[in-house]
Regions:
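Cytosolic covalent-transfer regions centered on His/Cys nucleophiles
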Residues: 1-140
Length: 140
């Protein structure tokens, strides 16, 4: 998995804005892919619901021909707004994931690894306390 982009927002951030910046970074990442069809797949997934609990949003889709999973990780201490969560829980983390369409395993393993980290209270606390993107990137 290639972690392409990390971002820390100290203030609340609107979901579409955070997703847009993260997706733009993935498009400019190391592996070419069809940005328009991938965006369509990502948008369809968002419409189905992407809140996983524990404050985590995972907009994700599979991309034909992609060499390895690409990920962007966003932390918003004060929350990500404009997106549906269960019981009005505050979403503070967003993992944008693009996975090779040809490998269901890569997709599943990457999502499981991120979810596992967020279930660790110490890791979650460190991520929320991170002061810059490089520090955040090192936590992966």
């Amino acid at each position: 998995m290639a972690l392409i982009y990390t971002r820390i927002y100290a203030q609340p951030v609107e979901f579409n804005r955070a997703l847009g910046y993260a997706y733009d970074a993935l498009v400019k990442g190391p592996y070419p892919f069809d940005a328009m069809s991938t965006w369509k797949g990502l948008s369809e997934r968002v419409a189905q619901g992407i809140y996983m609990g524990q404050g985590l949003l995972i907009p994700h889709t599979r991309v034909s021909g992609l060499q390895e999973p690409l990920m962007a990780f966003v932390v918003a201490r004060e929350g990500i707004t404009g997106i549906k969560t269960r019981n009005d829980e505050k979403a503070q983390f967003m993992c944008v994931l693009l996975s090779p369409a040809e490998s269901a395993m890569a997709h599943t393993v990457t999502i499981a690894n991120v979810a596992k980290r967020l279930l660790d209270p110490e890791w979650k606390e460190k991520v929320l306390a991170a002061t810059d993107e490089e520090e955040l990137k090192k936590m992966f």
